[in-house]
UniProtKB/Swiss-Prot annotation:
It comes from Salmonella typhimurium (strain LT2 / SGSC1412 / ATCC 700720). The lineage of its organism: Bacteria, Pseudomonadati, Pseudomonadota, Gammaproteobacteria, Enterobacterales. Its cofactor is Mg(2+); Mn(2+). Its EC number is 1.1.1.38. Homotetramer. This is NAD-dependent malic enzyme. The active site is at 104 (proton donor), 175 (proton acceptor).
Length: 565
């Protein structure tokens, strides 16, 4: 039976002439038809030939290849995004594996550091502390009325690079690009926001080109009151918004998530998204080895909000697999710069205190050190899994990895710190130190490792496997909150798409070319769980799938019809 593709309805727009060509969401450039050029006062403003989007994308790809540095490629792609968003997403989808590291990590780190230097065109919303009383007016200035996803940062903890001030805007822009490229969320529904509360980065304060508020960061009650003003203004403007907190400092990330997750549909990708993709990866890796996550002993290097968020989700998963909470917590060991977290360690943050080991249980350990180092922990715990979220390069030393491998034939090693310059150990070293036996997943992209004439592809434990699907699922289901169970369903769905589990070989995570398939599956699982949890209206499975299909945007030009304002 012959099938036909349903053609998108024509779009009625009031803009014309140069104004239309300057509107990134609507601009088609050389792809405007002869009729559209006549109807929208574009005749003579474009070259004669009417091109298809694929012809435009081919030209853009050739131009892209002419740039030699990753930051220049990033700037070029951002320029396309700011002039023709449909073409930008067609180009990125055509070359996702090549371009994802350019539009997001690791290249976005350099773009954040150089934000004021390479700034070209406004995108998103900048809300500075001196303008805090104009919050409602600022949000009313956003031209897109149907915003459904906001990614917001205050720029204080950008990747592993620290305080970048308003340069942190590069992260919400990049994240939302992946919501669209991987999760099919229309760019018209997205809004990047930076809360400009000053910066403690003296280099930025002294930089004559820095475009942010030149003031030390506000803190404590003033800071939280400012964030609350923002949240209330967002709720007033877009009551059904999905708000993603991004790259907030450890001291603020968890308090903000705790305070607002039941007030507005929100989540913190550094804490919950990282946890979801990591747990999904570990579920798949355990199944591929014929075991369960509950059977593994896990050591973390880095006990900040991200590391503790991953640990808590691992504990929740192993409880689902049958462990008691106490037994699940005894399998997880958190190490930070002061050593292993124990019940005798002072000044722990509340989210760290739940993850301590009891000193009474460590009396038999083979060590004479008062501070239990990562090597001490690895030597005594004999872990199956080692996870790095320290933001410090080189801390997974050869001695530590070899000690782990001595007791674990197939260790799982996950140096997750971003960007690449902050990774705890390179895949090349880990593979060599374990004689080719480690399963390695990283936070940043790495090329395959060649060791003793064998090729080892390296899985990237990228949050982009998770958050676009969560966003699509929330939009399609109309979920009012994001629950822990919705995040667990995302992890489980990701694990089900593992080539290593399904085929017995290949990467532990799906190929990037399949990421839209994975995102749609996660969207369905998240939407279904939202309905079961009572945070979304119950519908049939068919209706939920139809809602996902209806909300899945594709980078294709639509026919335009002229209308008045």
């Amino acid at each position: 039976m012959e099938t036909t593709t349903k053609k998108a309805r024509s779009l009625y727009i009031p803009y014309a002439g140069p104004v239309l060509l300057e509107f990134p969401l609507l601009n088609k450039g050389s792809a405007f038809s002869v009729e559209e050029r006549r109807n929208f006062n574009l005749s003579g403003l474009l070259p004669e030939v009417v091109e298809s989007i694929e012809e435009q994308a081919e030209r853009a790809w050739l131009q892209y290849q002419g740039f030699k540095t990753e930051i220049d490629k990033h700037i070029y792609l951002r320029n396309i995004q700011d002039t023709n968003e449909t073409l930008f997403y067609r180009l990125v989808q055509n070359h996702l594996e090549e371009m994802m590291p350019v539009i997001y990590t690791p290249t976005v780190g350099a773009a954040c550091e150089r934000f004021s230097e390479i700034y070209r065109r406004a995108r998103g919303v900048f809300i500075s502390y001196p303008n805090r009383h104009n919050m409602d007016d600022i949000l009313q200035n956003v031209p897109n009325h149907n915003i459904k996803v906001i990614v917001v940062t205050d720029g204080e903890r950008i990747l592993g690079l620290g305080d970048q001030g308003i340069g942190g805007m590069g992260i919400p822009i990049g994240k939302l690009s992946l919501y669209t490229a991987c999760g099919g969320i229309s760019p018209a529904y997205t809004l990047p926001v930076v809360l400009d509360v000053g910066t403690n980065n003296q280099q930025l304060l002294n930089d004559p080109l820095y475009m942010g508020w030149r003031h030390p960061r506000i803190t404590d009650d003033e800071y939280y009151a400012f964030v609350d003003e923002f949240i209330q203004a967002v709720k007033q403007r877009w009551p059904d918004i999905l708000l993603q907190f991004e790259d907030f400092a450890q001291k603020n990330a968890m308090p903000l998530l705790t305070r607002y997750r039941d007030e507005i549909c929100s989540f913190n990708d550094d804490i919950q998204g990282t946890a979801a993709v990591t747990v999904g990866t570990l579920i798949a890796a355990s199944r591929a080895a014929g075991s369960q996550l509950s059977e593994q002993k896990i050591v973390f290097l880095g006990a900040g909000s991200a590391g503790c968020g991953i640990a808590e989700q691992i504990i929740a998963q192993t409880q689902r697999e049958g462990l008691s909470e106490d037994a699940a917590r005894q399998n997880v060991f958190m190490v930070d710069r002061f050593g292993l977290l124990t019940d005798r360690m002072p000044n722990l943050l509340p989210f760290q205190a739940k993850l301590v080991q009891k000193c009474d249980n460590l009396q038999h350990w083979d060590t004479e050190n008062d501070v239990l180092s990562l090597l001490d922990v690895v030597r005594n715990v004999k872990p199956d899994i080692l996870i790095g979220v320290s933001g410090q390069t080189g801390l997974f030393t050869e001695e530590i990895i070899r000690e782990m491998h001595k007791h674990c034939p197939r260790p799982i090693v996950m140096p997750l710190s971003n960007p690449t310059s902050r990774v705890e150990a390179t895949p090349q070293d880990i593979i060599a130190w374990t004689e080719g036996n480690a399963l390695v997943a990283t936070g940043s992209p790495f090329s395959p490792v060649i060791w003793k004439d064998k090729v080892y592809p390296i899985a990237q434990c990228n949050n982009a496997y998770i958050f676009p699907g969560i966003g699509l699922g929330v939009i399609a289901s109309g979920a009012s909150r994001i629950t822990d169970e919705m995040l667990m369903s995302a992890s489980e769905t990701l694990a089900k798409h593992s080539p290593l589990v399904n085929n017995g070989e290949g990467l532990v995570l799906p190929a990037l070319k399949d990421i839209q398939v994975v995102s749609r599956a996660i969207a369905f699982a998240v939407g279904k769980m939202a309905q079961q949890q009572g945070v979304a209206v119950k519908t049939s499975a068919e209706a939920l799938q139809q809602a996902i299909d209806d909300n899945f945007w594709k980078p294709e030009y639509r026919d335009y019809r002229r209308t008045s304002i």
